[in-house]
Amino acid sequence: SRETGFIRELKRLGYEVKLNSSSLPAAGTVGLWFRPPEFASQLETSPAAWNFIYNEDYYPFDWRGLKKFPVVLTPYRELYEHYARSNIRTAMFTVGVNTTDFYAPETVFQPGYKVYPLVYYGDNNKSSPLAESLKKQSGNNKPSPLAGSLNAQNSTVQGSVWFMGRFWENGLPQLVPQGTPAEKGRELSRAFIAAVYADPETPAAKMVPAETAEAAAAGALVIMPSNPAVKEIYGDNVIMYEKESDFPGLVDYYLQNPEISRAKIVAAQKITADRLSSAASARRFKEILDWLRQNVEP
């Protein structure tokens, strides 16, 4: 599951972590809560100096009326928008993705190897115009014309378009990878290109989408709209475009230049593991605590 790498690394660093425990943290310690039963009432009586809540769900917990100050750890930076809209007092830190599930140590490029030409991540709340167009063209069971054209250009590619995100699970379930995060990660590790979409009108477009890190860690070349936060971390190893009409040409170029693609994929994998994995976030735990003590009153 998504939290595994983060919690495993915390334990390795010497922190005591109790999950779904009926006992409360000791006074003066740091409490880490992961989906505990009735966590809100437990938090109110927790004697811990700081109470961290790990939220792996895309939408926030409902804790209106909670007097304690919780600190949220989440893979989804977009969650901050939800908490701010609800006027919930909190601090939030992104703990990245679990590269145990999503990291593929080696990406294979060889003639005849079956790869998927496109893994398309639709935004959870709003799809891209390109995705809408593909949906209308594909029908219920037909492959996308875009995938077909890519397949015609490169005989090693088997045409298929994958969509990920809640928007697509009802509309085009046959195009959504199914299963556990590890199973989806294996699908991504067999992908050639992952197209990540972040609606430019939302705060997510100014942050690193979780899908970007997951796809990069799994060994797919990421192509996405221009995003300064992603550019700062990944540099030119994530491909970006200003106009959606440029997207098919970029896909064609990188499909026909696998060595260039491979170099960017390997570099993006390493960046993800070093900077955005949940284990990397756990190594910053002391830094997070120091910041809280200096800047926030519990």
Regions found by a protein language model. Give the residues of each.
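Nucleotide-sugar donor-binding catalytic core of glycosyltransferases
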Residues: 1-28, 35-46, 55-236
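Generic C-terminal helix-cap and adjacent flexible tail
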Residues: 290-298
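A charged, aromatic-enriched C-terminal amphipathic alpha-helix characteristic of glycosyltransferases
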Residues: 256-290
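Conserved acidic donor-binding segment of nucleotide-sugar-dependent glycosyltransferases
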Residues: 238-245, 253-258
